[in-house]
């Protein structure tokens, strides 16, 4: 028994044919921690599941949440392609669908292994052998019917960087791209897979795989495999696990307006887009801090909003330092300057009842004096 953890005694699943499937079985076989568990139920109806206390959550096919563990239990199903895109499917879920039929619709053989309550592995498509040989291989030609599988495989390749892609699988991916299936991907799903890939062991491989099948030029025409941003991402991978920092690093060589377009196209969270644009726009200025006089330094702080958004600015200087890959006194220096500027006493200005432009000019003068004193 691998990861059933004693839930067999639960009244909710007693006498049901329940199997652990997918990534949980795969990761356990690889000796990796299991973060999520997915279950398949064979021979049951939706009515039987709800009668046992399961909460239906699936809109397109029967998926239920366990009343105690809140893990997902899906009825065994088959699927048939009826239109382009990842939503172009009809599903059949009924008591007569076998476990083997359910496993056959899955993307990769290493994700098509099931485990019985007794710990027996059911592996009709050779997933264990592919795990042993470190191969990412499709279960059936139905792989080419769902464009999301291109993204998922690319993302999985970042998690398992020493796994190769089976030549036949790569050929299917190329056919999908040529058939225009990639064009049907929705922005949210592209971003979801990219963000997860950025947090994995080798994020650059996400783009390598997309490039190999021809999808990179369609999904991310701004990103070049030979670009400085890709090289920077490769160099910082072992220094930070943060998808946020890695995203900004990847685009550090792009014009800010191009980053904005990419972020808008895939509905990238503002936190990611803002940092990436900040690094692209002001990264070179940060590297040259030592050459700036007090006026340039103050302008730099104001343009980067360093005085108001300290956390984002800290992320900015951290990213810039990683990209430059040199140890310097820049972070300490700029933080001292920020502290000095923030410490400026404005009470005398208030006592003089200065307002508007007069107040702004007087405040600027005090800030410049504070910086000048520090750097002279």
Curated annotation (Swiss-Prot):
ATP binds at residues 23, 26, 106, 152, 155. Its EC number is 2.7.7.72. CDD domains: NT_ClassII-CCAase. It is an enzyme of class 2 (transferase). One of its GO terms (molecular function) is tRNA binding. GO terms for biological process: RNA repair; tRNA 3'-terminal CCA addition. Its cofactor is Mg(2+). Keywords: ATP-binding, Magnesium, Metal-binding, Nucleotide-binding, Nucleotidyltransferase, RNA repair, RNA-binding, Transferase, tRNA processing. CTP binds at residues 23, 26, 106, 152, 155. It comes from the Bacteria. The keyword Nucleotidyltransferase applies. A single active site specifically recognizes both ATP and CTP and is responsible for their addition. Belongs to the tRNA nucleotidyltransferase/poly(A) polymerase family. Bacterial CCA-adding enzyme type 2 subfamily. Catalyzes the addition and repair of the essential 3'-terminal CCA sequence in tRNAs without using a nucleic acid template. Adds these three nucleotides in the order of C, C, and A to the tRNA nucleotide-73, using CTP and ATP as substrates and producing inorganic pyrophosphate. tRNA 3'-terminal CCA addition is required both for tRNA processing and repair. Also involved in tRNA surveillance by mediating tandem CCA addition to generate a CCACCA at the 3' terminus of unstable tRNAs. While stable tRNAs receive only 3'-terminal CCA, unstable tRNAs are marked with CCACCA and rapidly degraded. This is CCA-adding enzyme. It comes from Coxiella burnetii (strain Dugway 5J108-111). The gene is cca.
């Amino acid at each position: 028994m691998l990861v059933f953890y004693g839930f067999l005694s639960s009244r909710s699943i007693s006498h049901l044919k329940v199997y652990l499937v997918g990534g949980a079985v795969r990761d356990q076989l690889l000796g990796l921690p299991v973060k999520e568990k997915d279950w398949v139920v064979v021979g049951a109806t939706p009515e039987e599941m709800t009668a046992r206390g399961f909460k239906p959550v699936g809109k397109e096919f029967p998926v239920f949440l366990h009343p105690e563990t809140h893990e997902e239990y899906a009825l065994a199903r088959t699927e048939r392609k009826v239109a382009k895109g990842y939503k172009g499917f009809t599903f059949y879920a009924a008591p007569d669908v076998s476990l083997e039929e359910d496993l056959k619709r899955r993307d990769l053989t290493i994700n098509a292994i099931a485990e019985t309550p007794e710990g027996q592995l059911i592996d009709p498509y050779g997933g264990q052998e592919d795990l042993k040989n470190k191969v990412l291989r499709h279960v059936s030609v139905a792989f080419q019917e769902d464009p999301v599988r291109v993204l998922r495989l690319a993302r999985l390749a970042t998690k398992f960087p020493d796994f190769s892609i089976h030549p036949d699988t790569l050929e299917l991916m190329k056919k999908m791209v040529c058939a225009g299936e990639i064009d049907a991907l929705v922005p949210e799903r592209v971003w979801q897979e990219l963000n997860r890939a950025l947090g994995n062991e080798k994020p650059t491989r996400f783009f390598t795989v997309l490039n190999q099948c021809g999808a990179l030029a369609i999904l991310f025409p701004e990103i070049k495999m030979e670009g400085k941003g890709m090289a920077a991402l490769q160099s910082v991978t072992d220094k930070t696990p943060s998808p946020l920092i890695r995203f900004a690093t990847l685009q550090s060589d792009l014009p800010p307006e191009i980053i904005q377009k990419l972020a808008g196209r895939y509905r990238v969270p503002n936190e990611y887009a803002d940092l990436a644009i900040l690094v692209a726009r002001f990264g070179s200025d940060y590297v040259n801090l030592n050459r700036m006089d007090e006026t340039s330094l103050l302008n730099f702080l104001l343009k980067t909003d360093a005085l108001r958004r300290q956390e984002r600015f800290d992320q900015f200087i951290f990213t810039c330092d990683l990209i430059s890959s040199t140890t310097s006194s820049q972070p300490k220096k700029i933080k001292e300057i920020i502290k000095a500027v923030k410490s400026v006493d404005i009470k005398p200005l208030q006592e003089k009842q200065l307002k508007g432009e007069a107040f702004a000019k007087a405040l600027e003068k005090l800030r410049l004096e504070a910086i000048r004193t520090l750097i002279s």
